[in-house]
Amino acid sequence: MINVNADPQEIAKFSELAHRWWDPDGEFRPLHQINPLRLDWIDRLAHLKGKHVLDVGCGGGILADAMARRGATVLGIDLAAKPLKVAKLHAMEAATASVEYREVAPEHLARELPSHFDVVTCMEMLEHVPDPSSIVQACAQLAKPGGWVFFSTFNRNPKSFLLAIVGAEHVLRLLPKGTHEYARFIKPSELAQWCRDSGLALESTRGMQYNPVTRRYWLSAETSVNYLLACRRPQ
């Protein structure tokens, strides 16, 4: 495994649960529930059909597989070998022909394939690495001029601590305890600055909300907890 900008404990955490990745009622249920929302948002802005797409931190391939089914040619990358094996197996079983997976760091791939992708996605990943700004820079370098770059992560404030950690992990048990570290959450202003520093132009920001009674997620202008950010690399 390439040891670049990765936390071994984070890799071990998700590797341990890799066999559960495609269980819609398992530990990754929230990812399955939010996937249609983020997929539609990305597709609405970037028009995935016929595009060459990179999914950074793809894990078991939930988003990568869905984007391929929207007509994109997708490469999913991660540094956790076990989730990648699960992603490859699922692609084979589901006959998703236009998706491939590689164990490689985005910083390394940016040197190998600069300005290569029409769309780059990095969802629910930045809060799990030691240097998220380095990931943002690599994503910018991987996008073609005019290409789209998408991020999603958690805001850092008392409300996000209460809802995303206390509520989601300890009260509602939507996620395993220890899934997230509050200190690694990222304010939208911080992420936006990293994007600008990497030469990206901000296009759209949306929040993601959850109703524990109806168990329904939706996008809104409220970015105080989970949020998504869309950028473009200038032509």
Feature names for model-found ranges:
Residues 173-190:
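Acceptor-substrate binding/catalytic loop of class I
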Residues 110-119:
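A short acidic, Gly/Pro-enriched loop at the edge of an enzyme's catalytic core
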Residues 51-57, 148-172:
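Conserved class I S-adenosyl-L-methionine
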Residues 133-145:
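A short glycine-rich, Lys/Arg-flanked "PGG" loop and its adjoining helix->strand segment in the class I
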Residues 62-108:
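Class I SAM-dependent methyltransferase SAM/SAH-binding core
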Residues 1-22:
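N-terminal, positively charged/glycine-rich alpha-helical extensions of SAM-dependent methyltransferases
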